[in-house]
Amino acid sequence: MTSWFDIHSAIALLGLVIYALDSHTRRKRRHPSAAIAWFISLLLLPYVAFPLYLFFGRRKVELAEYQHKKYTHAKDSKQSEINISSNEKLARALGLGPSVKFNNLNIHKDGAQALQALEACIANANKTLDICTFIFGRDESGYQISQLLAECAQRGVKVRLLIDGFGYYLDGLVSFKLLKQAGVEVAFFAPPFKFSLLGRTNMRNHRKLVIADRSHLWSGGRNLSHKYFQDTASTKKKQWVDLTFNFDGALAQQATIVFEQDWAFATQKAIPKKHNTATHLSAQQTLGVRLVPSGPDRSEDTIYTMLISGCYTAQDHILIATPYFVPDPTLLTALELACHRGVRVNLLVPESSNHVLADIARRFALRDLAQAGANIWLSPSMLHAKAFVFDDTLALVGSANLDERSLFLNYELMVAFYESRVIQDFSSWIYRQQHAASLYKPRRAGMWRELAEGLVRWVAFQL
């Protein structure tokens, strides 16, 4: 007679074998915490973990599945190679596109200005308008934006709206019937209940971008929902403070390529040939902006790598604004070592975020970083901005949170700014938020609190 232990062992063994084969044959480099969590879960709770792994276990997609545009850089002479900055060398090694010039940068001081810039972007589109968002709200702002998109399509502009398949359920189920009737193309990225996407339903598209005529880009951390634009003191609810920007320039063309790839993956259609050919770049540097996409469609974890590099190369200061702070041990150590080297590290997070588990998971990292000498500021608002500044040499601003889900699982999009004047503008934005924040004071955690924090950190890669 077969015992319960035999059945348990058989299922656990099957799960571990499939996990090992899947990771090896697909060459999936998993983060250590994720690998350990999957291994222990499959060993102890195979009945739960095995089905979850089949649905959520994949971390990278093959390039054959996800049609990918490649950049190759011209070979530099020995003399010019000496003059190339370390940031440029790293970007090339990661296969990122070129740094390009930009014009008319507008860093939105609040939600009202962000919405005004978005409305202008939609209204001024003449040929194409591509929008990617994690959440499209069933609310006042969502309705207002829908009306503008419908009007845009009715005047002959090709309008495409890409919404994450999971994010669609988070802020009310919006009906897009009227938009489609107006001529707007609507697609959902990896819907969670689509069986053909088995193993990929955990890959969320967290990118936020609006591209008009492949020449104007609106991007940052805001979703297209009312609370992301209502951050004035007049509101009775807790303010959501976010950071977006817009500008003109060639970077919008690079963003279009990323959108085309995401759209093709969501609709299962081929990318137009003009957007899917290898691009050869000259060796010349331009001190401007660079698109930094990251996610399952990239062989490297680009944003994570740039953050690690920034921590180790910073000489004077590091500024971070993020809603969730659940770094992996490597990134936390890099920040602590920066403190020990005398680098001024300032971290701005909300006093309490909209994710209770993320707040519990962050406690250990906050205590350790504060003890290393960092200044940690607690914003009374629901800070949703994502910005990382390293000296006056690099600012990364966009959609990525400082947690393992954003850095290792989600499709994310950041913009790297290299001009010191612009970097100082983003620094000033963070400092303004700090003025309303209180300084974090670490408290010693008891045994039960540490146990609870440890259990939550065990699944931190899924938060």
Language-model segment annotations:
Residues 154, 158-159, 317, 343-346:
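Residues at the starts of beta-strands that form the adenosine-phosphate
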Residues 130-131, 160-163, 319-322, 348, ...:
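Short catalytic-loop micro-motif centered on adjacent basic/acidic residues
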Residues 324-345, 350-351, 355:
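Helical hairpin unit composed of two closely spaced alpha helices linked by a short loop
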Residues 138, 300-301, 320, 327-328, ...:
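Conserved small/aromatic sequence motifs within transmembrane helices
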Residues 343-402:
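C-terminal structural cap/anchor segments
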Residues 307-317, 340:
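Long hydrophobic segments that form regular secondary structure
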Residues 1-304, 309, 353, 367-371, ...:
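N-terminal localization/anchoring segments of enzymes in phospholipid and broader phosphate metabolism
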